[in-house]
């Protein structure tokens, strides 16, 4: 089973349609679940301390959606990059040898808490470019679909 745990709701119609499109393409290969946790509003003129509080709250909400037996792939700017073939091999190896529940985590706009980073089994940097977090959902789903097609 594939699960996406995401911070915040999808707001733009075309992105929602992209998520729906790739979700329906993935379903013949495996079950997929998308969980949206509420994002925390950052105060005006937020300090580094305020940012950490927001990341902590959002991190707790996301961690509450992750079970012990799940293999967690965290989207992280400090993660390692892997191309579509490498991602496909990673997913295939997980399914074959160890885990049948893979959870992709997409944090909020301020990043993720240290606890979430520590829980991650793998940290994945999808690109050197910066994307809106909502667009990352579409990109991740497309890459998961592509990974299944490559297998």
Label for each model-derived stretch:
Residues 31-33, 122:
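Conserved beta-strand segments of alpha/beta enzyme cores
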